[in-house]
Structure formats: structure tokens, C-alpha cells
Amino acid sequence: MGITLPSHDRLPRAPCTPTSSARTMPETPHPRTILRGHKAQVHALAFVGNNDRLASGDAEGYVALWDLTIMRPTAVWQPHDNAILGIQGWGADRIITHGRDHKLAVWKLATSDEANLSKKLPLDDTSEPRPQPWLLHLIDVNTMNFCAFAACVPTDPPPAGDDPELLLAVPNTLASESIDIYHLPTQTRRHTVKSPGQNGMVMALALVPQGDSLTLLAGYENGVTTAMHLSAASGTWNTTYRTQPHSQPVLSLDVSPDGLSFVTSSADAVVARHPVPPPAGMEVLEQPLKVVNTKHSGQQSLRFRDDGRVFATGGWDAMVRVYSGKTMKEVAVLKWHEVGCYAVAFASALKAPQAAGGVEERDGTVVRRAGEVSVRERRIAHAEAAHWLAAGSKDGKISLWDIF
């Protein structure tokens, strides 16, 4: 029997309490909400908009956009015929999806467009069509690697009024150990970067703008992690860092918000921090900054929060682990799912919530008009101010935590 109404569980909030070393979760934290809507594994998560929307992608190619002010879906469609590998917001009204059907798509989806889209979740047994948003770009890519795309804004943005630009890194179409870098909106391939050595397939990627140039970070099947820098003068790619802290394939990597280091996780139990070498470096660095044996193998979807204070991983053991961004010490273990967690995402901790209604400005000072803030406005303000951490699991459910 199909599910006709999307359900979510409102669970008691566990307040965050400080300790002498870091503000950590209490001993038995609980998720604020469980979002139930996918019948297949949740493989990708991303907060979009002003923290009030969460995009989730599953193993059957469905994407659900959740309105976190009411904890309900506001748009559901199937952008791909196979599993979703990655999702990312781009600007105020664009969402990028990357599927195992060898396609990377960019969709225009403003809040005003949501009314025209289906709200029937993948769990719903329905014959109603699920219209797709407006498709802006579609690129044929290689997805044999299970490696999600990476993206960054070019260091030389276009003039005001022109279409926004973006660089995308994906595994090479023919050689799964090499990397292609595409440009949007032209959809042209700008670079093909070869692997420095026999490292097997590319498993995880990141792009880091540095001055007027670019650094490409990659994790490989054999546990090797590299940094390769594009010379602005010659247009060639040079390896600036190479190390092998992992004995198993790299599963994920993410760059610290200051752009000075990045952290990798693997099928082994190691979490390692690496330098992002400066562009002017003359030698190939080989030593990671820190290597931690966490004793917990299979941590993936490693993500920093944008204030750099913490990063999190999803574990094959169903645990979500939160680490200090500074010391790399484990500061919280979030347990709710019964099976492996494949995706995690942080909402922005730096975005200022938009002003709620019922306010006015007097002599340069914002003053609230008593009694004029609606329930919806309070919900919006809470959704935008919450320090959300979302975790997606093999069970198709998404746990939503409000952490320090």
C-alpha cells in the first residue's frame, strides 16, 4: 500500500552543552526530525537557499527538495535514471545533480518555481507525473568511479550582468584515473589532468581557487591523495603534494573553509589532514599535517561546516561522527540509524538569517512591531538560524540534527 502523506517524526530536542575543551553534544543526543520519503538509499545531501531547503538524492535517481520550515517536500523529480552521486546548490536558484547515468545536470529552481512541481515523494505509490524543473545545462560525464563532481567559481568572474560561471571537475570520460575540468555556461572541457602515477580510479575531488590560478585535489583507489596546481603562466598542471596515508580507497575529502588544508576519509579507519600547498611551491610535499586512526573504518561523505569549527562523516556502522576542525578530536557521535550512513551535509553557520516580518526601521534602528510576527515567519527564522546537520542512510531516511 502506498504512502499518501509524507511523514516526519518530531523528536525532543537535545540541547548542546559546553565542555572544557569544546562545546559538544550531550551523552544521548536525539535528531530534531526524521524525514521519510525515499525508498532507496540516500546517497547525496545539500542545503540550498538560505538554510531553509535541503536537497536529497537517492539510489534510484530521485531528488527531493525539503522545506525545513514545515519539514515537508516542496519539489520532487527524477533527474537521473540511476543513483545520484552528488548534489550542490549554485547561486540562489540553481541546483546541480550528478547521476550514475553518465549525466551532470544544472536545474533552475527558484522558490517561485516550486508550486509547479510535484510533492509526491518516491515512497508514494502514484501514477502522477513528476515534472522536472527547467534544465539549463546537461553534460555527458564518466560515472563508473562512484566519484561525485567538484565545483568552484573561477577566480576571474564575468562582468556584472553576464551569465554566472562555474568550473566542474569529474573523472575523465575514457580514463578513470584522469580528471576532466568543464566550464559553465559554455559546457566546454577546459582541462584534462592525468594522475601522477598508477593510483587506480579517482574516488574523490575538490577544486580550490588560489590567486589567479587553481589547485585540484584528488583521492584515489589505492589510498593516495594529491594536489595538482595549474600554472597561470604555462597552462600546465604540476603536482605539488602527494602522500598515501590510507591503506584502502579514499572515500571522501573536503577543504577547510580557510582553503589552507583538506581532510580525507577512507575505507580504512584513518582520517588525515593535508596541506593545500601555495602556488609558488617549488618542491612536492609528501607529509600530511596530521593522521588520526579513529578505530572506525568506512567513514565517508566528510564535510566541513563553513565556520571551520567542526567536520562530520557518515559511517558504514550507521554512526555520524563529528570532529573538531582544529584538533580533529571526536566531539560527538550521533546514533539513530540502524544501517550505514552514506551522506552528510551541514547548513551554513555563517549566513545571517533574513529579517522576519513585523519589523520596521526607526532612525536606523530595526524595531519589532509587537504581535505582528506570524507562525510561518517564526518557522522561517528558526530554519535559517539552526545549525543543521543532515545525515542520509541506506534505510532511505534522513535524520536532521541541530548541533552546536
From Swiss-Prot:
Record InterPro entries: WD40/YVTN_repeat-like_dom_sf, WD40_repeat_CS, WD40_repeat_dom_sf, WD40_rpt
Keyword Zinc: no
Cysteine pairings via disulfide bonds: none
One CC-aspect GO term: nucleus
Subcellular location: Nucleus
Primary localisation category: nucleus
Annotated segments matching region Disordered: 1-31
Keyword flag Repeat: yes
WD repeats by residue range: 37-76, 79-117, 197-238, 245-286, 294-333, 370-404
Key words, A-Z: Chromatin regulator, Nucleus, Repeat, WD repeat
GO biological process: chromatin organization
Family, per entry: Belongs to the WD repeat ASA1 family.
Subunit: Component of the ASTRA chromatin remodeling machinery complex.
Described purpose of this protein according to its UniProt entry: Component of the ASTRA complex involved in chromatin remodeling.
The protein's name in its UniProt record: ASTRA-associated protein 1
Organism of origin: Verticillium alfalfae (strain VaMs.102 / ATCC MYA-4576 / FGSC 10136)
Lineage of the organism: Eukaryota, Fungi, Dikarya, Ascomycota, Pezizomycotina
